[in-house]
Amino acid sequence: NRIAIWGWSFGGFNTLMSNDKVAYQIYPKSFLDTNGDGVGDLKGIISKLNYLKKLGIDIVWLSPVYESPFVDQGYDISDYYKIAEQFGTMDDFDTLVAEMKKRGMHLIMDLVVNHCSDKHEWFQKALADPDGPYAGYFYFREGKDGKAPSNYRSYFGGSAWTKVPGTNKYYLHTFAKEQPDLNWENPVVRKKIYEMINWWFEKGISGFRIDAIINIKKNLDFPSFPADGDDGLVSCDKMLASAHGIGTFLEEMKHETFDKYDAFTVGEVFHLKEDELREFIGEDGHFSTKFDFSAHVLSYGEHGWYDAPALDFNRWRTALFDTQKADLTVGFEANIIENHDEPRGATHYLPAHARNEAGVKMLAATYFLLRGIPFIYQGQEIGMTNCVRNDISEYDDISTKDQYLAALNAGCSKEAALHACYENSRDNARTPMQWDNSLHGGFTTGTPWLAENPNYTKINVTDQLNRPDSVLSFYKELIALRKAPEYVETFTYGTFAAAYEDVDHMFAYYRTNEETGQRILVAGNFGTDTVTLPLEKPADRVLLTNGKTADVILTRNRESASLVLGSCDCVVLLL
């Protein structure tokens, strides 16, 4: 049955041998700079492959390294076939792929094909002749009564339509005006995209993380909708939700590209209904997997993240558990607590009392052993945190600046707006990687493109490599446990069942191997009070703990068939 359900392939090796793998996202600009220009580069990544291998990483997701003006940090691509000069050369990229293969590691790249850069050759030709063939590569529409064709708001604020000077034509951009949306209705565009994808596969990569892919299908009537803000605009999501038939595009792309190379694909997909899961990540789904963003949507208020409510533990736990339950008979999700678009998990998901090494380890264990493929974002493995900034000028991120202005326009004080940025800005995840306690955290000998978090003197790789009780050491143990031969079947294919949901601030669940009967309890106490949990029977073994020794836990457990967890305690028990 498992073979029938999980028979897709992954970068040339069958998924039955790959679902136990661990992935790691690298944001190249902030990983490691080797030439002193303040920007991370491919040679920096190559130099740290042994570090990643020793951590237990099998798959590396590389955020965009293509040629770009970097209006949106590389998600505005001006040439899909070139490496941005600041990252190095194509020879450097080829070396990276080769060195990863030597270590049995796989590289997946970012695929950004909902839009390109306004500096891309296609768009420049479209602007030169808005009625010519290249205009058909994008969405150009006539204005109405001197206004934009419809009232959509882009993700980065302002109208999603920008006027072409000297004409009455507007082009659509669901992101920044420098990121015009590609017209997927045009078969020539699709063909060129597929050719590009296959070109990268021929260079030896194993797959793609697919950016904003739901956006490629538009409602071609581009109707206006009732405004959802004082600006008279409505989120472009409203238009996208009214579009139908995206599956046709996704299946064609899969057939023309991914299937030919047994590729691993992970989709950036939001707001799927439960009855759509199989279409996207089932046995014959559009993608191998997708990220679980159920917790991400809790971080938004009515007008973005500046007015987001404080994270509610019960809502967060319920969101993750609901995803786990929905996936059981369908496929695998990619589990994350951080990425380049999110604040740091150590700050975002942990209450104030748990923002310490014990709390970070607890968060790691409780998410990492869920059913699905775990992704780690650079710096997460050492517990990097959000960074306090004193002025909006210290931020680089385009969406952060938009949300800051939105907060001020809504009547928030400068202090409140900056605090919202501290809590939610994407730049929190983009500060330089903290390698050691030297100047700039060992990231660069120059001036970093984005100022480092000052806590690099206390939170850094070198310090934690030398401490067996560090967060980094705990992640190594966690990865080793998930891959251990005696438990790998349970952690990879075992069922999920929530546990102790009636206990306040308890994040607990069972992973069960239905073939062997092996049953494992994962439990973390996110609250401030000590909690005693009754067990079905005394535990057989403590597989991992972030605090008390295994002997202490088992002694108490065998005396009363119960588990005592203090604040921030987490434990993995073989029952």
Which residue stretches match the model-derived regions?
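Alpha/beta-hydrolase fold nucleophile elbow
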Residues: 2-9
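Short glycine-enriched nucleophile-adjacent loop
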Residues: 12-16
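Active-site and adjacent substrate-binding regions of carbohydrate-active enzymes
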Residues: 17-575
